[in-house]
Amino acid sequence: MKILILGATGRTGKQFAQLAAASNHQVSAIVRNKGKASLADVNYVEGSLADETLLNELMTGIDAVVVALNINRTSDNPFAKIVSPLTLISDSVKTLIPVMEQHGVKRLITVSASGVGDSWNNMPLVARLLIRNSNIWRAYEDHDRQEQVVRHSQLDWTIVRPVMLTEKDQDTYTAVIGNPRGGSISRKGVAKFILDTLGSGKYIRECVTLSR
């Protein structure tokens, strides 16, 4: 399978790129800085996610696109300074989707977060208070905008909403259509779910919550 990744140098995107390449898929990725590109078996192309010409060039022959973008902060501290444009995720999918449609590429998987959109009230109160009163909220706002854009497309999309992400060396996951409370999942588990779902054809036009 030929896969294009947006967000391949982020922690979740990198896990997916590594797993997909190790599984003998042809993986390409648009990155802002090739200096952050560290996987030998991935075709990194330096450029802007807003560059339609570049997207058109890379989309030829692609079977699926995975979006693992986020609104970045200077650290994991919830109150750390934001260093990404506040609409990076939603603007990127707004540019991406028409290019996919033009090339007849139907399969899209986007990584969002548990608590986004209609799953907000299912989060524990403490988590909601932290998110709403910190800079994490800016990412949640843009993930929500991304989800709305994706849902209104004609693509075969799957929205992935992981619960709290960890760096554990585990690739197990539990996928549900619904909103479980709490829990955690490793980034490797998210990557494994995405690759499994691309191979199975399941969860078309569905929003899936992931936990361990």
Question: Which residues are covered by each model-predicted region?
Answer:
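SDR active-site strand-loop-helix element
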Residues: 6, 30, 68-69, 108-114, ...
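Conserved beta-loop-beta element that borders a ligand/cofactor-binding pocket
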Residues: 147-168
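N-terminal Rossmann NAD(P)H-binding glycine-rich loop of SDR-like oxidoreductase domains
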Residues: 3-23
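Glycine/proline-rich active-site loop of Rossmann-fold NAD(P)-dependent oxidoreductases
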Residues: 120, 153, 169-173, 197-206
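NAD(P)H-binding glycine-rich loop region in Rossmannoid oxidoreductase-like domains
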Residues: 35-95, 99-102, 202
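Conserved Rossmann-fold NAD(P)-dependent oxidoreductase catalytic core, especially the SDR/UDP-sugar
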Residues: 34, 80, 91-138, 152
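Substrate-positioning beta->alpha
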Residues: 89, 142, 160, 185-195, ...
